[in-house]
C-alpha cells in the first residue's frame, strides 16, 4: 500500500464493461513529508474523490482484487485518509 494525493480525474468516453461504474483518478505518491513524488498513476476506485484528497492506494496485481468482482487494474484507491500523524 502507498500513501498518495489525488491530483486529477480521468473521464472515459468509451470503456470495457469492467470499468462501468468505476471512477478513475490520477494519484501521485507522497513521501514522508507529504510531498508528491514520481509521476501520476491512473487509479480505479468505487467512489469519486476530490482533488487534493489523501488516499491509500495499491499497485500491481493486488490492485485488481480491490473490486468484487476483480477488475483489470494495476492501481486502485482502497481508502480515504482522514488524518496523518508523523511522530519524529
Name these PLM-found stretches.
Residues 56-88:
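C-terminal structural segments of small proteins and small subunits
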Residues 18-26:
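Short aromatic-glycine-enriched beta-strand elements
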Residues 6, 13, 57-58:
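A generic structural signal for residues embedded in beta-strands
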Residues 25-29, 42-43, 56:
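Short, acidic/hydrophobic/Gly-rich beta-strand patch recurrent on exposed beta strands
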